């Protein structure tokens, strides 16, 4: 029996909606990354994007355990000498709630063009509303 290799145009992608209320950031991000890659499917192929679309609502209500709300640091750099910026989880969640989950999931996906394509299938929203009702997403319990 030959090894099965999925072809990009034959992949069936579903839409799922996840409620992030009171979910732990890392546990939610790990499951979302797994589903974006398509590892939950029997047709998973490492070099093909076989994952589903994931819509996460209420990302402003995500939580972290322990003292990470103040201790977890996020860094970015302007490109100039001495141009490093640092913020913690609480400040980033107040200012850009979607970015917290996006950064966590991005670190769990492969780097390169395939990983960027997978990340585009993640849609994060701070409130309970999302504009993807036309895709009829199924509710996913994590």
UniProtKB/Swiss-Prot annotation:
Keyword entries, A-Z: Ribonucleoprotein, Ribosomal protein
Disulfide-linked positions: none
GO cellular component, one term: cytosolic large ribosomal subunit
Subunit structure as annotated in this protein's UniProt entry: Part of the 50S ribosomal subunit.
Function noted in UniProt: This protein is one of the early assembly proteins of the 50S ribosomal subunit, although it is not seen to bind rRNA by itself. It is important during the early stages of 50S assembly.
Similarity field: Belongs to the universal ribosomal protein uL13 family.
NCBIfam families reported for this sequence: rplM_bact
Protein name stated in the entry: Large ribosomal subunit protein uL13
Provenance organism: Azoarcus sp. (strain BH72)
Lineage, highest ranks first: Bacteria, Pseudomonadati, Pseudomonadota, Betaproteobacteria, Rhodocyclales
Gene name per UniProt: rplM
């Amino acid at each position: 029996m030959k090894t099965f290799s999925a072809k990009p145009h034959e992949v069936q992608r579903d839409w799922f909606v996840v409620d992030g209320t009171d979910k732990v950031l890392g546990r939610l991000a790990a499951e979302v990354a797994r589903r974006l890659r398509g590892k939950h499917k029997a047709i998973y192929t490492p070099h093909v994007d076989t994952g589903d679309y994931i819509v996460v609502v209420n990302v402003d209500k995500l939580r972290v355990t322990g003292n990470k709300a103040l201790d977890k640091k996020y860094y970015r750099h302007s490109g100039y000498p001495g141009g490093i910026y640092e913020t913690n989880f609480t400040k980033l969640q107040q200012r850009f709630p979607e970015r917290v989950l996006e950064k966590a999931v991005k670190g769990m996906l492969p780097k390169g063009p395939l990983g960027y394509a997978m990340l585009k299938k993640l849609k994060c929203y701070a409130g309970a509303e999302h504009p993807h009702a036309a895709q009829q997403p199924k509710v996913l319990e994590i």
